């Protein structure tokens, strides 16, 4: 089968087309998964509005939209830990992007960890969920970085 | 600094605790990023409600909640392409999980591709966004798998 989009697909077909037509949700957001370009590990999950997506494409730095602060946000603007985007991908229904980044300072999480995913979900002897710290070393002290 | 949670943190502290306290959104969902345990590539982004999360933890197979169909969904129940979960992780604010899976049949996307992220976002000569197919080979024919 063809490795490219079928010739029968319209250029702006959501799944098979080659035109960017992001499907923003009711809040104007798409999901962004950010991975470390070297290790492949998931660093964080965040959201982009149309402006954040455009700025990321144009600048090559990761921009997000903070739901809690309700504002556009250039990753690293407070901490200096900028994310340089090496590759951007779009999913089948165009409501999620995956960016592979070079993480400035090595730490993406506001808690100082490399990744936001520093706890594994395990089960205890009774089968109940239990969290286990993994890769939970802090690479910076949040109190010193975010003043 | 310590690799485990600070002793000063309460066990049920959202960021530093070791108790699972998922923060579901207004629709009762958390985001799930699913990666291939071998390649590390992002296969898909989907959502879990409380029941999907519990069933995933208990069964070791990936369960999701389909927003479009508004129903609980065991990945592979139509296609047979089940996802075996090798590791689950939780993010800092407990509103996203990352699961590393062994993808049955090798393809996670309903279009037949290995990953839902089969298009790269590039820019054309004028700087406008342009999608380029990458890893876009179909491993199965959706018309034959979903009848």
Swiss-Prot record, chains A, B:
Keyword entries, A-Z: Amino-acid biosynthesis, Cytoplasm, Histidine biosynthesis, Hydrolase, Magnesium, Metal-binding, Zinc
Swiss-Prot/TrEMBL catalytic activity: 1-(5-phospho-beta-D-ribosyl)-5'-AMP + H2O = 1-(5-phospho-beta-D-ribosyl)-5-[(5-phospho-beta-D-ribosylamino)methylideneamino]imidazole-4-carboxamide
Membrane-spanning parts: none
Annotated residues for binding of Zn(2+): 92, 109, 116
Principal EC category: hydrolase
Pfam family, one: PRA-CH
Protein's recorded name: Phosphoribosyl-AMP cyclohydrolase
Organism: Rhodopseudomonas palustris (strain BisA53)
Taxonomy of the source species: Bacteria, Pseudomonadati, Pseudomonadota, Alphaproteobacteria, Hyphomicrobiales
């Amino acid at each position: 089968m063809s490795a490219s989009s079928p010739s029968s697909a319209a250029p702006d077909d959501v799944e098979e087309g080659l035109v960017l037509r992001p499907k923003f949700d009711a809040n104007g957001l798409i999901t962004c998964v950010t991975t470390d370009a070297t290790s492949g590990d998931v660093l964080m999950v965040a959201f982009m509005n149309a402006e954040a997506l455009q700025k990321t494409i144009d600048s090559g730095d990761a921009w997000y939209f903070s739901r809690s602060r309700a504002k556009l946000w250039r990753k690293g603007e407070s901490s200096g830990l900028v994310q340089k985007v090496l590759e951007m991908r779009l999913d089948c229904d165009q409501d999620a992007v995956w960016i592979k980044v070079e993480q400035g300072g090595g730490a993406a999480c506001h808690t100082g960890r490399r990744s936001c995913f520093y706890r594994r979900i395990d089960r205890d002897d009774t089968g109940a969920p239990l969290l286990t710290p993994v890769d939970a070393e802090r690479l910076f002290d949040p109190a010193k970085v975010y003043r």
